[in-house]
């Protein structure tokens, strides 16, 4: 099979017998593919195309399979029954070394031609909701590609007016028109309505004084007790009192009344809610309201929406595009102004006045002075942004222009599409020649159902410009983000003074001897060069406050005297020989001022120096630890934190790692009270793996330091 134009999908007279095949190995030939699908029925033609190909389908070059590529294609059968057989075996179907993706053929409306429109095609009709007008008009069928002059009778109207009124020409006898008919795209059962039938009898509820932390889900859960909730929205901006504004759509008028009776003036999370039926936006309001009174989540046409003159700068910031949970700036936030700064001499559409009396004209400068709360307008109010487009209805740029062209002359438009596919991303931009046309299009199409989706239309502006404009409006009150940043600064306090104590690995002594005490875990440390038991040694000049070698019996009597050091360690003995001391269990240091010294320490720095010297001058036998100590010194207290890193020999016995004061307390009951006093200064960490010990030292009293493995 060759890739001729007749085999291109979209050109078939009948697409019901065509199937989509994805993930095709490009090294396979057409004959192999036909042979694979021939068991399901007679194959008429196939079409193959490489992924991410820049060539259009009609201009595809002769197929040259690459070395290793992925393709997709379409297989057309003679009979439509073959499609059902293929879909039954579609799951797990393989061809060559790849698993195929089999799907039914879906026709893209953009590929249809004018010849395929039949007289009985269903056209897309938009019925504008108006309680005072009954929509009994019949649907009309119009072919696509109509000029602006041919569809002038299909312009949406919420009030009685004709085409000349839309174009800016005054008319005293407007022709009523309530139906919008858009060219049919060959799709059935697709309607475009401003308000769906489910909401035809509902009114939006306005919720005031919402707490700042309330979300649309919280609002939904709170109002579902009054009836079925169809939608909720919470404004992202705070008022001057720190509250938010929200809206709720109920399923019926009875539910709205029930919600007002149950929830109005009722406390909710510390605030009193004000629930009421929202007023429709009206240009007859001559002052900017303090509360939002504009369009709702589901916009309803205003009775006088198209009867007033256009205020250029106010129109640009007059409404708010409400989204579920993330509403932006809209008319409900800023209100509306009845005056205008545009005169009739500028050939702009004049206002419709039921009394046929000219309205007063007030310049914008004077209006801005009287209403300083109105924010600046967008940079380009004639440029609109539309999103949530149905890709089955609006598939190309021309169809987007057909939707907006009834409101005025379009300067340019853009429909965002995925690269190399032509599939719409669901959003686009439309720029009008006149600002009035953009305002009319925005007011009418915002919230309208196009196909199966509700579109949202607002003025196009950059995010930075929008943030700058909103910050200028809310300059009197900081935003929640700025407030949070200011609160977080108070959580971090820098300490007054801190210094680091570095403890190095001690020098081991090969002449140390260990005496074993079988009843307790305590062991006394002896040195050949040191005096024996019972002999007292005067403190040396370099270690004035430290007496490193005292026997266990003398330690109990001198705990309140000069510095005593007790080291509890385990011992391994093999065949009667003394083993190496593997790990220190408990290390105590109790220091007291010498009689020759001052009764009080001179300063905090002197106290820190003594702690540092004491930690440096410890000599341990065969087992040692290299701690990392940090001392933070303030006016009256010194906090020392030590995190040791232990070293031990390979033949370490786990029994020697038992670290406790039990053995020491059993051997010397008279020292129990003193040990409890020492423990009162010690702050132990509950995490044993960290091996962290923190000691609080009082600078104005004798220092007690205890370093204990936790």
Curated annotation (Swiss-Prot):
Region of interest (Disordered), ranges: 333-357, 502-544
Q: List, as start-end ranges, the regions of compositional bias called Basic and acidic residues.
A: 525-538
InterPro entries, per this entry?
Euk_RNA-bind_prot, Nucleotide-bd_a/b_plait_sf, RBD_domain_sf, RRM_dom
The entry lists its GO molecular-function terms as:
mRNA 3'-UTR binding; poly(A) binding; poly(U) RNA binding; RNA binding
A single Pfam family, by name? RRM_1
Provide ranges: composition bias, Polar residues: 333-348, 502-524
Q: Would you tell me the Gene Ontology cellular component terms? A: cytoplasm; cytoplasmic stress granule; cytosol; nucleus; ribonucleoprotein complex
Q: Give the UniProt keywords, A-Z.
A: Cytoplasm, mRNA transport, Nucleus, Repeat, RNA-binding, Transport
- CDD domains recorded: RRM1_Crp79, RRM2_Crp79_Mug28, RRM3_Crp79_Mug28
**GO BP of this protein:** mRNA export from nucleus; mRNA stabilization; negative regulation of mRNA catabolic process
Domain RRM, first and last residues per copy: 19-102, 222-292, 401-474
Q: What subcellular locations does the record give? A: Cytoplasm; Nucleus
Query: Looking at the record's lineage, which domain of life comes first?
Result: Eukaryota
Q: What does this protein do?
A: Binds the poly(A) tail of mRNA. Involved in the export of mRNA from the nucleus to the cytoplasm.
User: What is the name of this protein?
Assistant: mRNA export factor crp79
- Quick one: which gene encodes this? crp79
């Amino acid at each position: 099979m060759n890739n001729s134009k007749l085999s291109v999908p979209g050109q078939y007279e009948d697409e019901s017998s065509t199937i989509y095949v994805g993930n095709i190995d490009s090294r396979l030939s057409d004959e192999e593919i036909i042979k694979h699908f021939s068991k399901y029925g007679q194959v008429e033609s196939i079409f193959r195309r490489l992924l991410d190909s820049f060539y259009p389908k009609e201009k595809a070059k002769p197929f040259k399979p690459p070395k290793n590529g992925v393709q997709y294609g379409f297989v057309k059968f003679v009979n439509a029954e073959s499609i059902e057989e293929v879909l039954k075996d579609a799951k797990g179907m393989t061809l060559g070394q790849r698993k195929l993706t089999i799907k039914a053929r879906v026709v893209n409306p953009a590929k249809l031609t004018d010849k395929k429109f039949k007289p009985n095609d269903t056209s897309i009709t938009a019925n504008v909701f108006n309680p005072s007008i009954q929509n009994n008009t019949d649907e009309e069928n119009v072919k696509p590609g109509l000029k602006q002059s041919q569809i002038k009778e299909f312009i949406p109207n919420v009030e009685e007016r004709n085409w000349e009124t839309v174009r800016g020409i005054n008319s005293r006898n407007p022709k009523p028109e309530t139906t919008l008919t858009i060219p049919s795209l060959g799709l059935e059962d697709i309607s475009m309505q401003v308000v769906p039938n489910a909401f035809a009898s509902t009114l939006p509820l306005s919720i005031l004084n919402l707490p700042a932390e309330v979300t649309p889900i919280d609002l939904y859960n709170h109002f579902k007790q009054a009836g079925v909730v169809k939608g909720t929205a919470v404004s992202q901006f705070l008022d001057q009192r720190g509250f938010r504004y929200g809206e709720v759509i109920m399923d019926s008028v009875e539910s709205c009344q029930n919600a007002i009776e149950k929830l109005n003036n009722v406390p909710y999370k510390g605030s009193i809610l004000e629930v009421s039926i929202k007023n429709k936006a009206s240009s007859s309001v001559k002052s900017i309201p303090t509360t939002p009174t504009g369009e709702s989540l589901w916009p309803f046409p205003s009775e006088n929406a198209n009867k007033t003159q256009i205020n250029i700068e106010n129109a640009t910031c007059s409404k708010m595009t409400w989204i579920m949970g993330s509403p932006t700036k809209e008319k409900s936030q800023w209100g509306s102004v009845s005056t205008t700064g545009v005169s009739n001499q500028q050939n702009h559409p004049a206002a419709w006045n039921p009394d046929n009396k000219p309205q007063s004209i007030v310049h914008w400068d004077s209006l801005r002075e009287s209403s300083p709360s109105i924010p600046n307008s967008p940079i380009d109010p004639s440029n609109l942004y539309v999103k949530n487009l149905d890709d089955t209805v609006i598939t190309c740029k021309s169809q987007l222009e057909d939707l907006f062209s009834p409101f005025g002359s379009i300067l340019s438009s853009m429909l965002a599409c995925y690269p190399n596919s032509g599939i719409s991303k669901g959003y686009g931009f439309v720029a009008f020649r006149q600002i009035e046309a953009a305002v009319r299009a925005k007011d009418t199409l915002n919230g309208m159902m196009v196909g199966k989706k509700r579109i949202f239309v607002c003025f196009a502006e950059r995010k930075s410009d929008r943030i700058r404009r909103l910050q200028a409006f809310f300059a009197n009150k900081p935003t929640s983000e700025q407030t949070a940043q200011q609160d977080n600064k108070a959580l971090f306090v820098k300490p007054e003074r801190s210094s680091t104590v570095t403890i190095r690995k001690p020098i081991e002594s090969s002449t140390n001897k260990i005496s074993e005490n079988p009843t307790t875990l305590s062991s006394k440390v002896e040195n050949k060069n040191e005096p024996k038991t019972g002999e007292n040694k005067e403190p040396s000049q370099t270690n004035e406050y430290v007496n490193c070698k005292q026997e266990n019996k003398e330690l109990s009597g001198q705990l309140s005297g000069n510095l005593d050091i007790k080291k509890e360690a385990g011992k391994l003995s093999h065949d009667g020989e003394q083993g190496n001391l593997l790990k220190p269990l408990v290390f105590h240091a109790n220091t007291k001022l010498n009689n020759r010294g001052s009764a009080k320490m001179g300063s905090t720095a002197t106290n820190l120096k003594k702690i540092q010297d004491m930690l440096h001058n410890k000599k341990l036998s065969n087992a040692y630890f290299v701690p990392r100590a940090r001392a933070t010194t303030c006016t009256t207290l010194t906090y020392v934190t030590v995190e040791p890193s232990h070293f031990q020999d390979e033949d370490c016995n786990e029994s020697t790692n038992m670290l406790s004061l039990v053995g020491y307390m059993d051997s010397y009951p008279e020292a129990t009270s003193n040990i409890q006093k020492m423990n009162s200064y010690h702050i132990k960490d509950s995490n044993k793996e960290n091996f962290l010990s923190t000691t609080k030292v009082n600078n104005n009293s004798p220092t007690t330091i205890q370093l204990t493995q936790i």
